From Swiss-Prot:
Cold-inducible mRNA binding protein that enhances global protein synthesis at both physiological and mild hypothermic temperatures. Reduces the relative abundance of microRNAs, when overexpressed. Enhances phosphorylation of translation initiation factors and active polysome formation. This is RNA-binding protein 3. GO terms for cellular component: cytoplasm; dendrite; nucleoplasm; nucleus; spliceosomal complex. The gene is RBM3. Its main location: nucleus. It is found in: Nucleus; Cytoplasm; Cell projection, Dendrite. Residues 105-114 have a biased composition (Gly residues). The lineage of its organism: Eukaryota, Metazoa, Chordata, Craniata, Vertebrata. The modification Phosphoserine is found at residue 147. Arg-105 is dimethylated, probably to asymmetric dimethylarginine. The modification Phosphotyrosine is found at residue 155. It comes from Homo sapiens (Human). The modification Dimethylated arginine is found at residue 105. It comes from the Eukaryota. Interacts with RPL4. Associates with the 60S ribosomal subunits in an RNA-independent manner. Associates with ribosomes. Induction: Up-regulated by hypoxia.
Length: 157
């Protein structure tokens, strides 16, 4: 039995919730071997999610069912098995629609436990918030804005 089986993803954390507070709220469900609150690499500020690993996977399942949707430090938290992907369990990610980012970045097959906890881009906040441009300076959106804004094809005329 691997430690991944007893590993839970905890999302929606208050930015002030630390490892000790997280452990305090989950320790009543059984022995915990590891608690991690994921932090931004540059600012060391919490990214609002973390992981808890129980020594017994059954304890993790009980904790997940009991704590999912509960309030922790004034925020409603989401608890799920760390190995599951966001797409497979929530139909597309946890509220990431329209912002260009989800917890399981890089595709639907990579779960929360994939090891991609940090945003490696400078600043860490620019991902997905603007239109990307190609090397000619044109938008990669649905139409070329320099063509007069006509985004309809010839079949619509």
């Amino acid at each position: 039995m691997s430690s991944e089986e007893g590993k839970l993803f905890v999302g929606g954390l208050n930015f002030n919730t630390d490892e000790q507070a997280l452990e305090d709220h989950f320790s009543s469900f059984g022995p915990i071997s590891e608690v991690v609150v994921v932090k931004d690499r540059e600012t060391q500020r919490s990214r609002g999610f973390g992981f808890i690993t129980f020594t017994n996977p059954e304890h993790a399942s009980v904790a997940m069912r009991a704590m999912n949707g509960e309030s922790l430090d004034g925020r409603q938290i989401r608890v799920d098995h760390a190995g599951k992907s966001a797409r497979g369990t929530r139909g597309g990610g946890f509220g990431a629609h329209g912002r260009g980012r989800s917890y399981s970045r890089g595709g639907g097959d990579q779960g929360y436990g994939s090891g991609r906890y940090y945003d490696s881009r400078p600043g860490g906040y620019g991902y997905g918030y603007g239109r990307s441009r190609d090397y000619n300076g044109r938008n990669q959106g649905g139409y070329d804005r320099y063509s007069g804004g006509n985004y309809r094809d010839n079949y619509d005329n």
